[in-house]
UniProtKB/Swiss-Prot annotation:
Localization: Cytoplasm
Known partners and oligomeric status: Component of the small ribosomal subunit. Mature ribosomes consist of a small (40S) and a large (60S) subunit. The 40S subunit contains about 33 different proteins and 1 molecule of RNA (18S). The 60S subunit contains about 49 different proteins and 3 molecules of RNA (25S, 5.8S and 5S). Interacts with RPS21.
Keywords: Cytoplasm, Ribonucleoprotein, Ribosomal protein
SUPFAM superfamilies: Ribosomal protein S2
Protein name: Small ribosomal subunit protein uS2
Organism: Blastomyces gilchristii (strain SLH14081)
Superkingdom of this protein's organism: Eukaryota
InterPro entries xrefs: Ribosomal_uS2, Ribosomal_uS2_C, Ribosomal_uS2_CS, Ribosomal_uS2_euk, Ribosomal_uS2_euk/arc, Ribosomal_uS2_flav_dom_sf
Molecular function GO terms recorded: structural constituent of ribosome
Family: Belongs to the universal ribosomal protein uS2 family.
GO cellular component: cytosolic small ribosomal subunit
Amino acid sequence: MAPSNLPPIFNATSQDIEMLLAAQCHLGSKNLQVHMDPYLWKTRPDGINVINIGKTWEKIVLAARIIAAIDNPADVCVISARPYGQRAVLKFAAHTGAAAIAGRFTPGNFTNYITRSFKEPRLIIVTDPRTDHQAIKEASYVNIPVIALCDTDSPTEFVDVAIPTNNKGRHAIGLIWWMLAREVLRLRGTIASRETEWDVVVDLYFYRDPEAEENKEIEEAKVPGAEEVGAAAIESGLVGDSWEAQVAPAFAATGAAVPAGAAPGWEAEAAGEWAASSGAAAGAAETWATDTAAPDAGVKW
């Protein structure tokens, strides 16, 4: 929690602290950069540096106040070259109106005015100072303030406001961006207070692997036993043991539509017609024999 000598606005709720701990925002790396030492709480026996969560919350509130002080939200540029933060910066930009650069940062975006992607933001926010070093370097050339999510081993050169947190985990990155967006909207008046539940869940800011999501959808849509039954049976709907239940009523309905005396009548008709046909054929054979024998009778050998 925040120290007692700070204003009450810096006090975080117990739910916020629990979310930060659950997302492992307090777990840093084994290396420690000298400028990140004030944000360190302790070092575990296994060498992992633990970050002070109270300091993390203070910097989130401070960064949100800086963002809210900018009149035009589009003058804020959020950047993430790290894949785990690309979805988060896009969601942050959608909810706050900022400009997002997700993926590779094109060199010259802030310095080369000839390029189509040239921007002149008043503030940039980066996910990782190490992977987004090109954006920070160009921002230093044109005097753009920088807010960065910094781990214990992150370089802090040209970083004006460092938010100490775990910037390598997908849940930690998504939660920090979500809290930052919620705090900005609270300062703008969109959200009444921190106690008011935001209708945007934090899961929307988490990274999702496209291939894993596609495979998951395929597995959910896949019919069990498709390899054994075959595609034709799946299209007809006769899969597994259900065909007996579907075929039996069909035969029953067909049999019910036929009158009870239809079977003997059919046999009788068929027998009569066959007998008549046989008799006609026999008569034809006798007539043919008579016709052929008649000329032979008058022939003298």
